[in-house]
A protein has these predicted regions:
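Sec-dependent N-terminal signal peptides
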Residues: 3-13
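Beta-barrel outer-membrane channel/assembly domains of diderm bacteria
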Residues: 16-116, 145-152, 298, 308-315, ...
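Signature for the C-terminal beta-barrel architecture of outer-membrane proteins
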Residues: 19-32, 39, 46-53, 68-70, ...
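Flexible, surface-exposed loop regions and adjacent strand-edge segments
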Residues: 48-54, 88-94, 133-138, 175-181, ...
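Outer-membrane beta-barrel and related beta-rich outer-membrane complex signature
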Residues: 85-87, 130, 170-174, 276-278, ...
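Outer membrane beta-barrel transmembrane domains
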Residues: 90-92, 200-203, 227-234, 251, ...
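Residues on the solvent-exposed faces and adjacent turns
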Residues: 120
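A glycine-rich, basic-preceded beta-loop-alpha segment at the flavin cofactor/substrate interface
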Residues: 123
Length: 348
């Protein structure tokens, strides 16, 4: 299987002569700086987290002129696959100062609507969230084919990924690239914009011998409704030991209450969905965890670059994991400022 995948991707690269030239050599899609206060306790009432944390997430891309070739990387704080945050030392935990290139990959455009990528990459979520799938901080080392286009019966986006998921405590991508020779994960995902207000995706995943199907829908509702954004998703473990989970997220983002973006979500992800023996083969979003949970969120956009958000969530069953979790987050999006600085320097 592995030699076939490599040969397939390399053969596609031979058709890259018509690739569209990238307009810029160096791009900064994301440069977000965060700080948050986080509280977590367990069923017994034991406090496990009561800390002030910081985070940096930067996404960078270098385009090789006239070739369609590009390099991408996510540089981030955090020391494990399920966390992009580090402790300041204020609170219960000791300070930690970590910054790693968590992803690093090379891509090749194949005309206007296709690309292949090889390396340590982010996961593809489709129209769903990390409530029922991989934490957004998760990485995979492998190979990916991307197809994009608009057609009445064709998906707006299609990806096929073959890779390795593991090394949960190795945040440096260069310490994991040797896994390119191992395949324990495959995902085939199709996403479609059905109407101006509805987007849906469906996917098949195979991870360590576990077969899964996942579907998600995201809808924008009329401004006058009590709910303006609706997102529902479902994941089914087909074999072995079949089980399933789902999540629903509702947000009021328009009119009088829109300035605060109040939201409510419910998630139910049994521990067994991603369990391989005694281990979790995949970690979903840490703010959701496993089991039955309800959560309440808000988000206030102070300026174009600065926003504040809150979350409080409670476990509704006896599933292992945290009971209460609460956090207050401040985020500053520095990418526009860095782009202005970049333009000023290159215009001289």
């Amino acid at each position: 299987m592995k030699p076939f995948i490599v040969a397939f991707l390399l053969s596609l690269a031979c058709f890259a002569q018509d690739a569209k030239q990238a307009p810029k050599i160096f791009e900064i899609p994301t440069a977000d700086v965060y700080t948050r206060y986080r509280y977590i306790d367990t069923n017994a009432g034991t406090v496990t987290a009561d800390d002030l944390q910081y985070r940096f997430t930067g996404r960078f891309r270098v385009n090789v002129p006239k070739t369609g070739t590009y390099f991408g990387s996510r540089v981030e704080t955090g020391s494990s696959i399920g966390s992009s945050w580090s402790n300041t030392g204020i609170g219960r935990s000791k300070s930690e100062w970590t910054l790693n290139a968590k992803t690093f990959f090379i891509g090749q455009q194949l005309g206007k609507q296709a690309a292949i990528e090889v390396g340590a990459m982010d996961m593809e979520q489709g129209a769903g969230t990390e409530a029922t799938y991989a934490d957004v901080d998760t990485w995979t080392e492998g190979y990916r084919l991307r197809l994009n286009g608009e057609g009445k019966y064709l998906p707006s986006k299609f990806t096929a990924t073959f890779g390795f998921i593991g090394d949960f405590n190795t945040p440096n991508a260069f310490g994991r690239l040797y896994r390119l020779g191992e395949i324990n994960y495959a995902q085939v995902l199709a996403e479609k914009k059905l109407t101006k207000t509805i987007r849906a995706s469906a996917e098949y995943d195979r991870l360590r011998g576990i077969d899964l199907f996942r579907a998600a829908t995201k809808m924008s509702l009329p401004d006058s409704w009590w709910i303006n954004d609706l997102q529902v998703e479902n994941v089914v473990r087909v074999a072995p030991r079949a089980t399933s989970g789902w999540a629903l997220n509702l947000v009021k983002s328009k009119n009088r209450l829109g300035w605060l973006n109040p939201g409510i979500y419910y998630s139910h992800l049994p521990t067994g969905v991603y369990k391989d023996g005694a281990q979790q083969a995949l970690l979903n979003g840490d703010v959701y965890g496993t089991g039955k949970r309800i959560g309440f969120t808000t988000k206030y956009q102070a300026t174009k670059a600065l926003d504040f958000s809150t979350l409080i969530t409670r476990k509704l069953d006896s599933d292992p994991g945290f009971r209460w979790r609460a956090q207050i987050v401040a985020r500053y999006q520095a990418a526009p400022l860095l782009k202005q600085l970049q333009r000023a320097l290159t215009s001289r």
